């Protein structure tokens, strides 16, 4: 069995309220991610992104990891781990530094980003991500990459995503109990955006909403930059609960009915379609019209989407007042397990009054039959995030080696200069042999 570290393999692990998913991806030379292992199992011990039964979570993680290892024929030692929950918060900050040389260096960029993130965050919270939005040099704004440009002062605008220390520790603890190392914690909504959005959508303005079992993770982009992140602690499970109460059926059966027969828009359901609904307490199952089922599902999905719409409208007003691009010309992208229900895009268009699409993972090869579903968007996004970290890590090593060689050559030149200076061989004192000697 090959160790994951022996090849360019990255592993993404999502521990959600409804499911635990583990994906193993191989980073190909062209930058594509080739999925070679998939593992998943129903989640136990999680609620709205938080751990409420550690032992149950550990068992679920182990089961998903075992499946992925078996399929990929590799030994997993570390993972990129998704994190969600209402404790996730965000803030946009600005930093400014003088430019040290004639032109901006990578060190200047790192300094200005460090200045921007050196702010007070909420008590018992820590910074999860620092994501640059844009830079400004003197009077020139909207710069994406300032390296090599000239100026006196540089400003950076960054988006900070923070999480509660203990919430993060608990989910990491569950993974470490399985003998795994966490390479990095990544906000689930950010991972999903890496998976389902195109560069054009980010540039035009888009909101991605990952609708899971316990939470809806939101990420809003305008002008190519991440402007806002939010977790709403209501999602697909409230729809399941409504079905269970409305028809007196066990929650597990209500979930199966929602997935197989559910529709978020009653007007597209045929009047003669019927659904068999199991009962509780040994009573015989009943038959009901699918239209009746849709009448329970549609109002709840509409309510959930309205919560997202309120968040978007508040953000757009704030961005407009700040003079920042606020239009979402690319509309809304819905993804996640609870986004797979029939009629959701049409239902959402009535709420958002803009174009809506259901987002599936992009830019992957390999086991796409398994992984190219909205259900796996976060896990695939973790692989893309891990790929970037791998490539950036290699570039950083190469940069350090180049810098080290450059420094060695500089020291050698300095030593040679001193030696030649001592012998009077520099600054025009170099002895010239007599022409006759050359003859």
Swiss-Prot record:
Main subcellular location: membrane
Localization per record: Cell inner membrane
Gene3D superfamilies per UniProt: 3.30.1490.110, 3.30.420.40
Keyword Cell inner membrane part of the UniProt annotation: yes
One GO BP annotation of this record: FtsZ-dependent cytokinesis
Transmembrane helix in keyword set: no
Cellular component GO terms held in the UniProt record: cell division site; cytoplasmic side of plasma membrane
Keyword line: Cell cycle, Cell division, Cell inner membrane, Cell membrane, Membrane
Superkingdom of this protein's organism: Bacteria
Subunit text: Self-interacts. Interacts with FtsZ.
Family the entry assigns: Belongs to the FtsA/MreB family.
Function: Cell division protein that is involved in the assembly of the Z ring. May serve as a membrane anchor for the Z ring.
NCBIfam families (alphabetical): ftsA, PRK09472.1
Alphabetical list of HAMAP family matching this protein: FtsA (MF_02033)
Descriptive protein name: Cell division protein FtsA
Organism of origin: Shigella flexneri
């Amino acid at each position: 069995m090959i160790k994951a570290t022996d090849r360019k393999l990255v592993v993404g692990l999502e521990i959600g309220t409804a499911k635990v998913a583990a994906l193993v991806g191989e980073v190909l030379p062209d930058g594509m991610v080739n999925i070679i292992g998939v593992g998943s199992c129903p989640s136990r011990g999680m609620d709205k992104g938080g751990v409420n039964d550690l032992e149950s979570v550990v068992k679920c993680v182990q089961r998903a990891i075992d499946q992925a290892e078996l399929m990929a024929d590799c030994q997993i030692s570390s993972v990129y781990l998704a994190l969600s929950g209402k404790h996730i918060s965000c803030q946009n900050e600005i930093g400014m530094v003088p430019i040290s040389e004639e032109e901006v260096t990578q060190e200047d960029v790192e300094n200005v980003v460090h200045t921007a993130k050196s702010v007070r965050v909420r008590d018992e919270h820590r910074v999860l991500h620092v994501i640059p939005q844009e830079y400004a040099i003197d009077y020139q704004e909207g710069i994406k990459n300032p390296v090599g440009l000239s100026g006196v002062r540089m400003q950076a605008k960054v988006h900070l995503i923070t999480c509660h220390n203990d919430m993060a520790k608990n989910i990491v603890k569950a993974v470490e109990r399985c003998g795994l190392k966490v390479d990095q914690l990544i906000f689930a909504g950010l991972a999903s955006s890496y998976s389902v959005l195109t560069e054009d959508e980010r540039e035009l303005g888009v909101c991605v909403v990952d609708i899971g079992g316990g939470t809806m993770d939101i990420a809003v982009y305008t002008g190519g930059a991440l402007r806002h992140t939010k977790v709403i602690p209501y999602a697909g499970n409230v729809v399941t609960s409504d079905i269970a109460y409305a028809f007196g059926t066990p929650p597990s059966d209500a979930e199966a009915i929602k997935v197989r027969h559910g529709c978020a828009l009653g007007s597209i359901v045929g009047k003669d379609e019927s659904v068999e609904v199991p009962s509780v307490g040994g009573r015989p199952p009943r038959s009901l019209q699918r239209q009746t089922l849709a009448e329970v599902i549609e109002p709840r999905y509409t309510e959930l989407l309205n919560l997202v719409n309120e968040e978007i409208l508040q953000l757009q007003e704030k961005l407009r007042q700040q003079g920042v691009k606020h239009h979402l010309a690319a509309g809304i992208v819905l993804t996640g397990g609870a986004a797979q229900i029939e009629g959701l895009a049409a239902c959402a268009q009535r709420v958002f009054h803009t174009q809506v699409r259901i987002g599936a993972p992009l830019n992957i090869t390999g086991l796409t039959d398994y992984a190219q579903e909205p259900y796996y968007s976060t896990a695939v996004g973790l692989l893309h995030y891990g790929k970037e970290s791998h490539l950036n890590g290699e570039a950083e090593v190469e940069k350090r080696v180049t810098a080290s060689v450059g420094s060695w050559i500089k020291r050698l030149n300095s030593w040679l200069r001193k030696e030649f200076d001592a012998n009077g061989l520099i600054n025009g004192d170099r002895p010239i042999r007599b022409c006759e000697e050359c003859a």
